[in-house]
UniProtKB/Swiss-Prot annotation:
Protein name: Glypican-4
Coiled coil spans: none
Free-text disruption phenotype from the record: Knockout mice have short fore and hind paws, and display a significant decrease in the length of the snout.
Classification via InterPro entries: Glypican, Glypican_CS
Sites carrying sugar chains: 494, 498, 500, 514
Expression sites (tissue/organ): Highly expressed in developing brain and kidney.
Source domain of life: Eukaryota
Subcellular location: Cell membrane
Propeptide stretches in the record: 530-557
Entry keywords, A to Z: Cell membrane, Glycoprotein, GPI-anchor, Heparan sulfate, Lipoprotein, Membrane, Phosphoprotein, Proteoglycan, Secreted, Signal
């Protein structure tokens, strides 16, 4: 009897210890949840010290929980912020790449034009002296128009260059025939013979082709970098739908409510949620990849025949060669013009000598050897810039289709693939068994985690798709050497974010309904139920065994 009484006492003590241990485990579990909750800046009074009944929860599992209703609501907002932050970080990195490369190209092209103008001015001052200074505005106007084309694009390069050569011919014709008086009407007649007489040789034709192709390619490429920068900037501002926010809450913080604060979401579970939340962004991928391919095509032109550096660097020598050609053939050119436009009126004798003295154009062209000729702009070369950008463009391909995976690869968002059995699947700590859905809006009809309205594409995304499509077309024109007109998307969609999907209908409340289980009693839920049962049973297992032992002892007697 004494022995039996001792056993009963021991079992009673064991049962009491087990109960205390269970309370202590609960306290520890919720205290850690509370600590992390407070660390995010939330009120500790929202968080219970012990597990409570979860009937008040609208999204997270309604078992015993460490989350109050206030916690679930604040976790919902926090999960949305976490998602926006991670997506923004990934997009901002890409946006910064395009922004910095656009800035480098822009600085390079502008400095290249400045260097070319300075080089021409220095060369012509030393070669032609006062004669050039008297006519320098003609060359200044040339560079003003070239700069205006690069900055604004509203210049017809062919017409502008034709006008430059016509004006230069008028000036040259006066200089080589300084003994005559020419009216404006006569000089207008002279300009009509430019194509027929070719007073400047083949330089105007070649230079017009080279300048047009090089400037079109350079400006289009720079504008392409700017468009890529702006598209990424606009799309990076995501506004999750209510359904997406529910899924994010369930993925990121509902595990905390179960006390599983160190367990991260399963990778495939995260992938399905991100593909649902970023469905519209996935639809950018096709036009984005076409745009990247077109940019790479133009980059090849910049490295080869349309290299603006190789065109602008020797432009002073080419124009001077044209002037020399006119000087060498001035007699033949003048005779043919006199035949076509009629003999000009000679100047009075006194004015003839003064005019010849002022022109002083009888001297031959003197070779110019500058002490230091600028060969690069902005401290680099076009080849180096293009090589760098080509590498970045190749890396940017398929950015939007890979964005969900990139987000889930962030250790803040999901566990690695190697932890498939030790991760949060939305209901418990177990393997995630659903297949990963495809990218894009059309593939989200069967997404097991996020309800997506596949009939309402995001307007902002559609605008960016159109911007990419138009820019791709202009890239192809530039690749073929054709001039292009540019459009302005800077004012479109300002301040908008993608993904809201609420433009056509009123957005539902954040906590309008409990998250729908699309699969009924899934394998995930069964695994979680089993896991939850194990967690609840452990504290009372010892007490149950003791009672069973006492009953058996009674039978033995």
């Amino acid at each position: 009897m004494a022995r039996l009484g001792l056993l009963a006492l021991l079992c009673t003590l064991a049962a009491l210890s087990a109960s205390l241990l269970a309370a202590e485990l609960k306290s520890k579990s919720c205290s850690e949840v509370r600590r992390l909750y407070v660390s995010k800046g939330f009120n500790k009074n929202d968080a219970p010290l012990y597990e409570i009944n979860g009937d008040h929860l609208k999204i997270c599992p309604q078992d015993y929980t460490c989350c109050s209703q206030e916690m679930e609501e604040k976790y919902s907002l926090q999960s949305k912020d976490d998602f926006k932050t991670v997506v923004s970080e990934q997009c901002n990195h890409l946006q910064a790449i395009f922004a910095s490369r656009y800035k480098k190209f822009d600085e390079f092209f502008k400095e290249l034009l400045e260097n070319a103008e300075k080089s021409l001015n220095d060369m012509f001052v030393k070669t032609y002296g006062h004669l050039y200074m008297q006519n320098s505005e003609l060359f200044k106007d040339l560079f003003v128009e070239l700069k205006r084309y690069y900055v604004a694009g509203n210049v017809n390069l062919e017409e502008m260059l034709n006008d430059f050569w016509a004006r230069l011919l008028e000036r040259m014709f006066r200089l080589v025939n300084s003994q005559y008086h020419f009216t404006d009407e006569y000089l207008e007649c002279v300009s009509k013979y430019t194509e027929q007489l070719k007073p400047f040789g083949d330089v105007p034709r070649k230079l017009k082709l080279q300048v047009t192709r090089a400037f079109v390619a350079a400006r289009t490429f720079a504008q392409g970098l700017a468009v890529a920068r702006d598209v990424v900037s606009k799309v990076s501002v995501v506004n999750p739908t209510a359904q997406c926010t529910h899924a994010l809450l369930k993925m990121i913080y509902c595990s905390h409510c179960r006390g599983l604060v160190t367990v991260k979401p399963c990778y495939n579970y995260c992938s399905n949620i991100m593909r649902g939340c970023l469905a519209n962004q996935g639809d950018l991928d096709f036009e984005w990849n076409n745009f990247i391919d077109a940019m790479l095509m133009v980059a090849e032109r910049l490295e080869g025949p349309f290299n603006i550096e190789s065109v602008m660097d020797p432009i002073d020598v080419k124009i001077s060669d044209a002037i020399m050609n006119m000087q060498d053939n001035s007699v033949q050119v003048s005779q043919k013009v006199f035949q076509g436009c009629g003999p000009p009126k000679p100047l009075p004798a006194g004015r003839i000598s003064r005019s010849i003295s002022e022109s002083a154009f009888s001297a031959r062209f003197r070779p110019y050897h500058p002490e230091q000729r600028p060969t690069t702009a902005a401290g680099t070369s076009l080849d180096r810039l293009v090589t760098d950008v080509k590498e970045k463009l190749k890396q940017a391909k398929k950015f939007w289709s890979s964005l969900p995976s990139t987000v889930c690869n962030d250790e803040r968002m999901a566990a690695g693939n190697e932890n498939e059995d030790d991760c949060w699947n939305g209901k418990g700590k177990s393997r995630y068994l659903f297949a990963v859905t495809g990218n894009g809006l059309a593939n989200q009809g069967n997404n097991p985690e996020v309800q997506v309205d596949t009939s309402k594409p995001d307007i902002l995304i559609l605008r960016q798709i159109m911007a990419l499509r138009v820019m791709t077309s202009k890239m192809k024109n530039a690749y073929n050497g054709n001039d292009v007109d540019f459009f302005d998307i800077s004012d479109e969609s300002s301040g908008e974010g993608s993904g809201s999907g609420c433009e056509y209908q009123q957005c539902p409340s954040e906590f309008e309904y409990n998250a729908t289980d699309h699969s009924g009693k899934s394998a995930n839920e069964k695994a979680d139920s089993a896991g939850g049962a194990h967690a609840e049973a452990k504290p009372y297992l010892l007490a149950a065994l003791c009672i069973l032992f006492l009953a058996v002892q009674g039978e033995w007697r």
